[in-house]
Amino acid sequence: MALLEAHRLSKTFGGLVALNGVSFSIEPGEVFSIIGPNGAGKTTLFNLLTGIFSPTEGKIVFDGKDLTGLKPHQTARRGIVRTYQQTTVFKKETVFDNVVIGQSVRLKSGIWGAILGTYAARKEQRRVREKAWEMLSFVGLSDKGNRIAGSLGEEGQKRLSVAIALASNPRLILLDEPVGGINLEEIDGLIDLLRKVRNSGVTICLIEHKMRMVMTISDRILVLSYGVPIAKGTPSEVAANEKVIKAYLGVRRAT
């Protein structure tokens, strides 16, 4: 059974049609990429999947349950988390504290438990701290946990964003341009990290403009153009599709 299914998703803003009849599924354990020119509807699609927007039409099913219309904190609790194109770390806090804060969506003891220092709250806080160090080690930042997050370079902040997302124990992680703004050597390191994430059992859906990265890591690719799906398949199938070459890849080849 597919982990996530999107059924004929459409989204309009006034008279603007941002998405029109987009359907796809994501299988457990795969890397599923969404590509297309600027304005193709990729970010709008992510906003629908995470509950930031509700679809004008269509349905979203995750693990067999209808998520359509849920709020972002509700989709996060169901196991869908997201990183953003512009990293959203707390730059004045430590790297470690960022990962601790990122686990708040899963805390069970609540604010009063934390204030009163109940046994359950103390036990949960210990688990949160242990998880934070575990995730920093996983992404290669264990030696930077006590640094201020804003002192990290772009690649380090990308890794931190992944650690924050993973700390909430997601089943599906949505990555918005995970290698945007970094150099080729750093891209290879992040590709290795994303493979490690996938091999740990977390399913990945990503938006990315860097085609070498997309073609290297993806199991399947969905191509959007002006809010409409124009191709779907393996990297080799998509790369050979004339509509894709004309709408997107051809632009890259020409440059």
For each predicted feature, which ranges?
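Glycine-rich phosphate-binding loops of nucleotide-dependent enzymes
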Residues: 1-255
